[in-house]
A protein has these predicted regions:
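Active-site loop immediately N-terminal to the catalytic Tyr-X3-Lys motif
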Residues: 43-47
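A short helix-coil junction within the Rossmann-fold of NAD(P)-dependent oxidoreductases
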Residues: 18-27
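C-terminal helical subdomain
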Residues: 76, 92-128
């Protein structure tokens, strides 16, 4: 779990810190951080990956305000399951699994055609998980427990 946090969170933090002065001096630009829907809320089989992505989303939200003063956009990309060698190793169902080409198209269009803070896809999955975020823990934990046992 520490390795995952070091790579996903601290690696991204170090990259942003490395370009921070450049963007602020330029007073223009766009920083996009790749998170995941796994960071929306605690999920089974995700005790390392999920928290690292939750930290990235929180980081993106925080620096949004810091960079906005310098006319630098910040966005966060929250993809669902994308077919990669890493997801090929998963031993659980991955609803709405998409191709890397699908993901690239969604990210590109989101960055070019939108001023949205978050680019998330596929909507069938992301909107469901966003709804789960507003539920009280008692209901959320009950529902996820039932869904996982199916």
């Amino acid at each position: 779990n520490k390795f995952v946090m070091d790579v996903n969170y601290f690696g991204t933090l170090n990259c942003v810190k490395a370009v921070e002065k450049y963007f602020k001096d330029k007073r223009n630009g766009h920083i996009s951080i790749v998170s995941s829907i796994a960071g929306y809320r605690g999920l089974p089989n995700s005790s390392g990956y999920g928290p690292s992505k939750a930290a990235l989303t929180n980081f993106a939200e925080s620096i949004y305000f810091d960079f906005k003063k310098f006319n630098v956009r910040v966005s966060v990309v929250s993809p669902g399951f994308i077919k990669t060698p890493l997801t090929d190793k998963n031993e659980f169902d991955m609803p709405f699994l998409r191709s890397p080409e699908y993901a690239a198209d969604k990210v590109y269009k989101g960055l070019v055609n939108s001023n949205s803070f978050e680019i998330h896809f596929p909507k069938q999955l992301t909107l469901t998980l966003k709804f789960l975020r507003i539920l009280p823990y008692k209901i959320y934990l009950f529902l996820v427990d039932k869904l996982v046992k199916r």
